Amino acid sequence: EAGPGDPGLTTILTGARGTGKTALLSYLADEASSRGWVAVNVSALPGMLDEILQQTLRNSSHLIERKGAFKLSGIKVADLAEIQFQSADNDHPTWRIRMEEALGQLAEADAGLLITVDEVREDLDEMVQLASVFQHFVRDRRRVALFMAGLPTHVNGLLQNKSVSFLRRANFHELGVVSDFDIEQAMRKTIEDGGRGV
């Protein structure tokens, strides 16, 4: 990582089914975690943005403080006891504002956030919203990365959307078919690393 704004921090993987896109996203998330980043992994499905926020808060709970959900608003003693609570968050902040708060707390802990999105779909409004908001995170020099993977037709469809022109400057990698020899070598190494022989 060269720092906030590094073009490699926005990466799109494409390839046919079975070329290892999901496995590579998982590997990259594990690698980021081993370097002190918080990694969240989602699929492009409805509810994806909330899932990103919830995973960010959960996976960084050792680094950031969650705001209280309720506050005491009144106590009544006459006619027995009565206690009233109300939501501490009356203003209902947007997804972007809640993510900026989390990113700010992560920055204070000297940690970054990697968001991985698998099975990119051009027909999901939340994909467009994520890409649009992510460019603001980059412009604000947040320590954040976005790695996405999908079939070429879906990725190309997403890139045609006028609202995500930022993604057209992403780092692209097209994954090809893995040869039988490479598969054999990887399996052999995995088995031998596990203390077994072939």
Predicted regions and their residues:
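Conserved NTP-binding/hydrolysis module of P-loop NTPases
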Residues: 33-39, 49-85
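Conserved Walker B catalytic segment
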Residues: 88-163
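Conserved catalytic segments around the Walker B and adjacent sensor/switch elements
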Residues: 11-14, 29-48
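A short helix-turn-beta junction within AAA+ P-loop NTPase domains corresponding to the substrate/partner-engaging
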Residues: 160-176
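Conserved nucleotide-binding/hydrolysis micro-motifs of P-loop NTPases
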Residues: 18, 45-49, 122, 151-156, ...
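Walker A/P-loop nucleotide-binding motif
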Residues: 5-27
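Conserved small helical "lid"/interfacial subdomain of P-loop NTPases
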Residues: 175-198
